[in-house]
Amino acid sequence: MNVTLITTDGRKRKVSINTFDEARQFVCNYQYNSPAEIIVLMDGSFILIDEEGKLKNLDLNRIATDIAHENNCIYPSDYIVGDVLLVDDVDEFDSLPFE
């Protein structure tokens, strides 16, 4: 399935994933084996982030933060760090195998 990768330097590009594990590779560093977190947006799509990104001092992702604020998904003082995936097709994502 195709999803949108939003990087901390402001770039957006389509990437293909075939498993949840592949999706996690884009946002979480396996060196730390971090869990991924889902932030559900008002239209039903969601952003996949590194749950421990702030602990790792990852860079601010201004675009993802703006999207989350516009959808009232995070507190006004909160922010998102690290590269994220924007997933539009929740049903297709849910059907992905884990590995």
Can you say where each PLM-predicted feature lies in the sequence?
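Detector for the mature cores of small, proteolytically processed
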Residues: 1-21, 25-26, 30, 34-99
